[in-house]
A protein has these predicted regions:
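Glycine-rich phosphate-binding P-loop
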Residues: 57-82
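Long, mid-chain structured domain cores
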Residues: 1-25
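Generic detector of short, locally flexible boundary/turn motifs and exposed helical patches
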Residues: 22-28, 38, 73-79, 104-109, ...
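Conserved nucleotide-sensing/catalytic segment adjacent to the nucleotide-binding pocket
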Residues: 83-150
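Hydrophobic, Leu/Ile/Phe/Ala-enriched alpha-helical segments that form helix-helix packing faces
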Residues: 43-51, 76-81, 129-134, 152
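Hydrophobic/aromatic beta-strand patches that form the interior of the parallel beta-sheet core
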Residues: 59, 85, 111, 159-164
Length: 177
């Protein structure tokens, strides 16, 4: 065996050792990572590693309904020892927040926004809260980022990571408008 180069392992390398395989990364877009439903454990670990990093991070998660997007975000937050807050969600019932209380403004929180719910919401206070949260130096996770960017000034280029979660490899992620 001949070594040609040594490098410090990245968190993707550590996850590959832990789970026995590398995370699939888009060849054309290096910030896009693909997972299947059977890989939820790997996805949760991946999110937890991202959530452990300090500072602003904007993560988008694409996927059809009932594939495990929200549950993975919450589980990743728990693994990273971070508190999670729904700004908008459909996990238990439809949640649309229009304000946060004093203790909920924290760089150590993970803010979860359902882009489909927020895109349909007409309450200006909710839209103002979303804008406020987007400026915080913390982690924001947007489900359905493609729908989210249709109704505000953000673009896909603003996202640091895009995660695609599918039932199976060939499932298409499509949205009805």
């Amino acid at each position: 065996i001949e070594r040609t180069k040594l490098r410090m392992p990245e968190f993707r390398d550590r996850l590959a050792v832990r789970h026995g395989r590398y995370i699939e990364q888009d060849a054309g877009d290096k910030k896009t990572f693909r997972f299947e439903r059977e890989d939820l454990g790997l996805l949760v670990d991946f999110l937890a590693e991202l959530f452990k990093e300090d500072g602003h991070k904007l993560i988008g998660i694409r996927g059809m309904p009932r594939v495990g997007k929200t549950e993975s975000i919450v589980a990743g937050s728990v693994c990273a020892h971070k508190r999670w807050l729904f700004i908008s969600s459909t996990l238990i019932k439809q949640t649309v927040r229009s304000s946060l209380i004093k203790g909920e403004y924290d760089a150590n929180h993970v803010y979860i926004i359902d882009g489909a719910v927020t895109a349909r919401e007409t309450n200006p206070k909710h839209q103002q809260l979303v804008e406020e949260v987007m400026t915080l130096p913390s982690i924001k996770v947007v489900e359905h980022p493609d729908l989210f960017i249709e109704t505000n000034q953000y673009s896909i280029d603003d996202f640091d990571y895009i995660i695609e979660l599918r039932e199976h490899e060939n499932q298409k992620i499509e949205y009805d408008h």
